Amino acid sequence: MNYRVLHLADLERFLELRMEFLLSYQNVPKDFRNITENYLRKHMETEDLLLLAAEEEGSLVAACMVCFYETCPMVDNPSGKYGELRNVYTKPAYRRKGISEKLVGMALEKAKERGVTKMRLHYTDDGLPLYQKIGFVPEERYMEKDL
């Protein structure tokens, strides 16, 4: 298994895996793949997005992404630098082999290298045990509103 950072040359293979992930638990609008592709083309080679993958024999079998952003310093995060872990997904045939755990570990290390001091994520029920094992704790006082 080869673990690595993805680049624009990997875009199509990453998009296939991301769409497989999203479709595994929700309906996805018809144009969502194009919207995602446009976003990735704009951000993949910048400092505000990192894509990691596990690859076996030329096929992506797992991947995740981290979106980076900075806010005003907070008491619990004086740097104000955050990473948001997104779309950790492993193909079903490769699950329960520690692949996602290794990818998340890589994401955390890469985030630290960028000065990030707090990582956030939204989790599925399937992913909760992994994130708790790694040391993530649920944050109860979080809200959002569609605009």
Where are these regions (language model features)?
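Conserved acetyl-CoA-binding loop-helix of GNAT-fold acetyltransferases
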Residues: 87-90, 96-109, 113, 133-134
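A short helix-loop-beta-strand connector motif used in the catalytic cores of GNAT acetyltransferases and
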Residues: 41-53
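Conserved active-site alpha-helix within GNAT-family acetyltransferase domains
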Residues: 101, 113, 117, 125-145
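Conserved beta-strand in the GNAT
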Residues: 53, 59-68, 84, 89
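A short beta-loop-alpha structural element at the N-terminal edge
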Residues: 2-16
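Conserved GNAT-fold acetyl-CoA-binding loop/helix
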Residues: 19-40
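Conserved acetyl-CoA binding element of GNAT-fold acetyltransferases
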Residues: 76-92, 141-144
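Conserved hydrophobic beta-strand within the GNAT/NAT acetyltransferase core sheet
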Residues: 85, 118-121
